[in-house]
Amino acid sequence: MPTVMIIVREGKTLDQKRAAAKGVTNALVEAFGVTPDQVSIQMIDQKAENIARGGILLPDRPKS
């Protein structure tokens, strides 16, 4: 049973999460030959202050 953990920046809508869940599930069904009910997905919302890129927290990074 494949399990996927998706960590996303806070603020994604339910529709965006639904679309991601459907797309990831479909990809794993095709790649692994499992049924959709065998795919487990956890989506974890993270505040920008808890994410760093290049050693710099996202709120501290220059806006591009």
Where are these regions (language model features)?
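A domain-level signal for the structural core that forms small-molecule/cofactor-binding pockets
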Residues: M1-S64
